[in-house]
Amino acid sequence: MSVMAGFAILITEAVVAFYKRVHAINFGVYGATMVGKTTLSYQLRTRGEVQQINKRTVGLERASRKVVKFDGDSHTLKSADIGGEAMYWKQWVEDMKSRKVKYIIFMIDHRHLDSTSNLDHQLAWKFLVDTITSNIWPNGKRKKEADYPMAVSIWANKYDIWGDKYPLREGQSIDKHDIYEPFKYGMRQLNDKGIPTFKYIVSAKSDPEMVYKGITTLIKDY
């Protein structure tokens, strides 16, 4: 390899690295209340053990930039913290529409395993899937190709809490865990729309590497 060719490669790599640094990829993080969305937001900013957060997010907060570094790769993403109560679901739509979100993370925990009568996740998931797969926005405006996400991921959070309580059966892979069962139909709906889905387990509060690996996998694989 000539000196000039080597120099050109270095310049190209520098340009790509700079682009990744300044060009933020829009992520949408949604889910029922108290599932860990705010904790995830803190984790993406601080990378480390996140202290207990007792304050609930009210409405839609301003989106902020976060730099994710994992396995020698670096990406800048932008996400907003949004409340999970049903009264704020319309603001999920506002966030998706205004920022043209490219990747969506829908966070769940184990509450539906603890109590089959708890439908917090299922109701929020149905609303989200119906919104994404619809050809029009709630205001009647028809969606464009860029309005659909590149992928939707279900993150089963608090694995450090429920992992031992609800262990995998012998020979069962993590993506077949019962925690994902209520969301299979919605995932098929997204797939039928041409939107890939991705299951992931995470402990947003205590395991930053799981968080950063999940983000990087979404960007690289989808």
Which ranges hold each PLM region?
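Short acidic, S/G/P-rich loop/turn micro-motifs used as interaction or catalytic elements
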Residues: 35-36, 85-87, 110-115, 159-163, ...
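Canonical P-loop GTPase G-domain recognition
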Residues: 161-222
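Well-ordered, non-membrane alpha-helical segments in soluble/globular domains
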Residues: 118-140, 170-186
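Conserved beta-strand/loop subsegment of P-loop NTPase cores
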Residues: 103-106, 136-160, 191-201
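Inter-motif core of Ras-like GTPase G domains
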Residues: 89-133
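Glycine-rich phosphate-binding P-loop
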Residues: 26-49
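Switch I (effector-binding) loop of TRAFAC-class P-loop GTPase G-domains
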Residues: 45-78, 86-89
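Short, flexible boundary segments at extreme N-termini or domain junctions of P-loop NTPases and their
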Residues: 1-29, 216
